[in-house]
Swiss-Prot record:
Zn(2+) binds at residues 11, 14, 37, 40. Component of the ClpX-ClpP complex. Forms a hexameric ring that, in the presence of ATP, binds to fourteen ClpP subunits assembled into a disk-like structure with a central cavity, resembling the structure of eukaryotic proteasomes. It comes from Wolbachia sp. subsp. Brugia malayi (strain TRS). ATP binds at residues 124-131. The lineage of its organism: Bacteria, Pseudomonadati, Pseudomonadota, Alphaproteobacteria, Rickettsiales. Belongs to the ClpX chaperone family. Residues 1-56 form the ClpX-type ZB domain. This is ATP-dependent Clp protease ATP-binding subunit ClpX. It comes from the Bacteria.
């Protein structure tokens, strides 16, 4: 068949023209254009379904969504849920786009094997590392699992082995192996399992280098044997085989002290005309972390092989007062929106003054845990209000949270409400 007709596109698999099939789907990249028709998609899915089962419609639509998501689309979605961290959003958008493209196996056309690139998120507590990873899974419509690296131990020791991470991913995918095999795993506190020293110790490092080595095996791509219900393996147990080649691993950690390692490497390079002596200590630390190199992570205590399997690094900045105000009011699932919705079920209109919102952010900053304390502050502040509203009180009323209430730590209500507005007691 002559494929030189400029007016027609052809399926790259069966060579049928676009006017011979119902649908012809292409990738959105500017490079090699690849086309696949609906008939080839159906045939491929049937071949897979005979062994693994599954629903054509859900799998087909999910795959199409993966193909059509551009980095810009991913970033727009992330920005609706995460405040700030523009650089991290940019990095993750590109990383997820490339990961989806490799999963679509366009590389099979060009005979180029594309290896996945796992991601390292470096940032202080409460800066949004976990939220970014969760939101990335949501925009990509893939299962998501999270693990705390400090709970993992190498095989033969008490604790969770690394396969337990994959068990959680299977559970998130409702034990659909094919779906789990393209999911996202977020491993938090990765900085807590660093090697204690650069020299080899004769004692076993149960939760340090040994765990890095164990994680390395599943992160670089292997067929793992996963206990169906999690927990430790035992001989009588049946295992589920999970191919980790297309699972995206995102690691996160605060890496306290990493800035000092970077500064030591750069010592002397900022002296003279290039030095900015006007920078604050916090600004200097922030800018330093953005210069992190693989050698710095190795010096910190990650083994070279592990660093090599997490080639993409994104640094998250500490949230300031303005950021915390935005966290409270701007995202699609902003905390204040959530509490207003909760009280709306009891027919109570909840409002916050601008000064109250600012005071909540100020109080959260005093804990030095980023956005993590915001919910706890609001829970304590609104406890009595939610209790009374849940019992039918305040129905049809408007409650205005003021700065004084925030400073007091709870919303003290004046039951002699005037103009349907309930205020703090004098």
């Amino acid at each position: 068949m002559d494929n030189n007709n400029d007016d027609l596109h052809y399926c790259s698999f069966c060579n049928k023209a676009q006017n011979e099939v119902d649908k012809l789907i292409t990738n959105s990249s500017d490079g090699l254009k690849v086309f696949i028709c609906n008939e080839c998609i159906e045939l491929s899915h049937k071949a897979i379904s005979q062994k693994k089962g599954g629903s054509f419609n859900s799998d087909y639509m999910s795959d199409v969504k993966l193909l059509l998501k551009k980095p810009e689309d991913i970033k727009i979605f992330l920005s609706k849920h995460v405040v700030g961290q523009e650089h991290a959003q940019h990095v993750l958008s590109v990383a997820m786009y490339n990961h989806c493209q490799s999963m679509a196996q366009f590389n099979a056309i060009s005979d180029v094997e594309i290896e996945k690139s796992n991601v390292m998120l470096i940032g202080p507590t409460g800066s949004g590392k976990t939220l970014l990873a969760k939101t990335l899974a949501k925009v990509s419509d893939v299962p998501f699992a999270m693990a705390d690296a400090t709970t993992l131990t190498e095989a033969g020791y008490v604790g969770d082995d690394v396969e337990s991470v994959l068990s959680r991913l299977l559970q998130a995918a409702n034990y659909d192996v094919a779906k789990a095999q393209r999911g996202i795993v977020f491993i938090d506190e990765i900085d807590k399992i660093t090697r204690k020293s650069e020299s080899t110790s004769i004692t076993r490092d149960v939760s340090g280098e040994g765990v890095q080595q164990a994680l390395l095996k599943i992160m670089e791509g292997t067929v793992a044997y996963v206990p169906p219900q999690g927990g430790r393996k035992h001989p009588q147990q049946e295992f589920i085989q999970v191919d980790t080649n297309n699972i995206l691993f995102i690691c996160g950690g605060a890496f306290e002290g990493l800035n000092k390692i970077i500064e030591a490497r750069k010592k002397g390079t900022s002296v003279g005309f290039g030095a900015d002596i006007s920078q604050s200590k916090e600004q200097k630390k922030k800018n330093t972390l953005h210069d992190v190199q693989p050698e710095d992570l190795i010096k910190f205590g990650l083994i070279p092989e592990f660093v090599g399997r997490v080639p993409i690094t994104a640094v998250l900045d500490e949230l300031d007062h303005e950021d915390l105000v935005h966290v409270l009011i701007e995202p699609r699932n902003a905390l204040i929106k959530q509490y207003k919705a909760l009280l709306a079920f009891s027919k109570v209109n909840l409002e916050f003054s601008d000064e109250a919102i600012s005071a909540i952010a100020e109080k959260a900053m005093s804990y030095k845990t980023g956005a993590r304390m915001l919910r706890a502050i609001l829970e304590s502040l609104l406890l009595d209000v939610m209790y009374t509203a849940g019992n039918g009180g305040f129905e049809g009323s408007t409650i205005v949270i003021t700065k004084e209430m925030v400073e007091l730590g709870k919303a003290v209500i004046n039951h002699n409400n005037k103009g349907n507005v309930i205020t703090v007691n004098d």
